[in-house]
Swiss-Prot record:
Belongs to the zygin family. The lineage of its organism: Eukaryota, Metazoa, Chordata, Craniata, Vertebrata. Involved in axonal outgrowth and fasciculation. Residues 19-49, 271-300 are annotated as: Disordered. Expressed in nonneural tissues, such as heart, lung, spleen, muscle, testis, placenta and melanocytes. Residues 214-286 form a coiled coil. This is Fasciculation and elongation protein zeta-2. Residues 28-38 have a biased composition (Low complexity). It holds the Pfam family FEZ. The modification Phosphoserine is found at residues 135, 176, 195. The keyword Glycoprotein does not apply. Homodimer; disulfide-linked. May form heterodimers with FEZ1. Interacts with synaptotagmin.
Amino acid sequence: MAADGDWQDFYEFQEPARSLLDQENCNASPEPGAEAGAEAGGGADGFPAPACSLEEKLSLCFRPSDPGAEPPRTAVRPITERSLLQGDEIWNALTDNYGNVMPVDWKSSHTRTLHLLTLNLSEKGVSDSLLFDTSDDEELREQLDMHSIIVSCVNDEPLFTADQVIEEIEEMMQESPDPEDDETPTQSDRLSMLSQEIQTLKRSSTGSYEERVKRLSVSELNEILEEIETAIKEYSEELVQQLALRDELEFEKEVKNSFISVLIEVQNKQKEHKETAKKKKKLKNGSSQNGKNERSHMPGTYLTTVIPYEKKNGPPSVEDLQILTKILRAMKEDSEKVPSLLTDYILKVLCPT
């Protein structure tokens, strides 16, 4: 009894008596000694042992329920931003139409209409004269054959005689205005005067000419003779100059014709070479593996040479055309002289020292 009196002060800190539900939730079975002490009205000699520890209580709270027990409550879910937005009507209205909006058609918009009116653009129809039928290369080549065009134009030009040249020179002198009206007659004035006298003499009959000569004195006849000799000399010099100019023009024409003809031949040969190269590429087994090539270079090596050309103010000179004609002929023959001729052309024409 003394022991009970000593511990009486600490009974208020003792764990309260558990209810029947707590005992059922606890898996621990009561100890035999405790039951015996309880039946004997014990517990007087020590503290009553706790039925469950804290860990056991936690495990009991989160354990799955038995098949016969009541269904558990709905598990608690954390509230996130996504779960809040799923129930938001404004957010759903915005996201439902996202990606389904059609792009703006710029051509049919009102802004584009105003833009076109500001630019004032008008469609221009392509004229039929600018449309070429390039289906047939041969026909196009014949249409653009500069050599035949030039030759046909040359054949149509009539050849002038010496008398016609003289008459044209006289007409040019007569039609040309006098730049200065000086008292001293210039050479053109004297030539025009003599030409007029010659024309009057031609028009006059033979009888009137003889009568006029008979009336002249010896001094007047000598003066007329000197004037005629001077006119003949001047006309002869002018005729020689015009004939030399005609020879130069004919030579230039021949050089241009030969250049154009060689250029067309090289272009045709280059086209044939390209077609042959395409056919060779299609073949699986080339013929070059069966035999050796006797030439030091592959056929068509110099045929595709690119000739540099610097565009000047005027047309190329006759000397330049002659050099280019030599290079084109060597290219047509696929000759090994092409590099040397090309070097001379670059040093003499493009980069003269």
